[in-house]
């Protein structure tokens, strides 16, 4: 059965439950985005640019997740949100490249300080 209001697939009860979960998931994406934006405001230009790139990844992940139409997806995969939004970001190859670049710059900076 499909709920015409949400266009989500599943029984009426599944769709109702999934819509509640979906609202919570969207709120979690908002919370994580707010934290990254707050952090970015305190960073220097290069690091801020990287954090803004992470925000782009976050919004792409949000669109991907929120675009799912199967009630079962939200019920099965998102019932317990926890750190799932952060994990989606951390597993992204672009985030891994940003992290690797940061670590490389940190090592280079430490080596320069040591002389």
Predicted regions and their residues:
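Charged, low-complexity intrinsically disordered segments and flexible loops
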Residues: 1-115
